Amino acid sequence: MRYYAEPVGRLIEELSKLPGVGPKTAQRLAFHLLHVPRNEAVALAKAIVEAHDKTLYCSVCTNLTDRDPCRICSDANRDRAVICVVEEPRDVVAVEKTREYRGHYHVLHGALSPIEGVGPEQLRISQLMARLADPELKEVIVATNPTVEGEATAAYLARLIKPMGVKVTRIAHGLPVGGDLEYADQVTLLRAMEGRREL
């Protein structure tokens, strides 16, 4: 039995393909979009198509960009001695929001996951290895997520990079600011203890 007009059903189906959007949220979004003025709906559709058509991968760091090389790789004020390796473009945004890191990046576009069929060939590891030939490069910061896949990726990268004479570091993991010890899991507490520093 069809509950929606065919165009509405198609819209709900397409929206439900977005990550984190289930059928109910897709339905809610679809009905919201049908209630906004037509010009707003058209502006959203145009923004999606334009982002899809005009976004490309930086030939240096493989981050998403609208120009090549990207603004970060083109910035002469960035520290070329350090590359921060992240899983996804959104991770670059997260690090940049700290306003503390001034080095370069490399985006892998995923993490090693044999169960999901993601091996080194599916990630942008070969491009990273090519960048290690830069004589200015002194350190690679591995900032993959603290998941099983992220840890496996970090260990794999360390094995590849260390023999090349480049320092490899891993971001610290630990308790979030405002978090209570009693609610932390054992792995998080262990990492917090291992990553302690002198006051």
Curated annotation (Swiss-Prot):
Entry-linked SMART domains: HhH1, TOPRIM
Gene Ontology BP terms: DNA recombination; DNA repair
Zinc finger (C4-type): 58-73
Ranges of residues in domain Toprim: 81-176
InterPro entries for this protein: DNA_Rcmb_RecR, Hlx-hairpin-Hlx_DNA-bd_motif, Rcmb_RecR, Rcmb_RecR_Znf, TOPRIM_dom, TOPRIM_RecR
Keyword flag Transcription: no
Keywords tagged on the record: DNA damage, DNA recombination, DNA repair, Metal-binding, Zinc, Zinc-finger
Superkingdom as given in the UniProt entry: Bacteria
UniProt keyword annotation of Zinc present: yes
Disulfide bonds: none
Coiled coil: none
Xref: SUPFAM superfamilies: Recombination protein RecR
GO molecular function list: DNA binding; zinc ion binding
Record Pfam families: RecR_C, RecR_HhH, RecR_ZnF, Toprim_4
NCBIfam families reported in the protein's UniProt record: recR
Annotated function: May play a role in DNA repair. It seems to be involved in an RecBC-independent recombinational process of DNA repair. It may act with RecF and RecO.
Family in the record: Belongs to the RecR family.
Name of the protein this chain belongs to: Recombination protein RecR
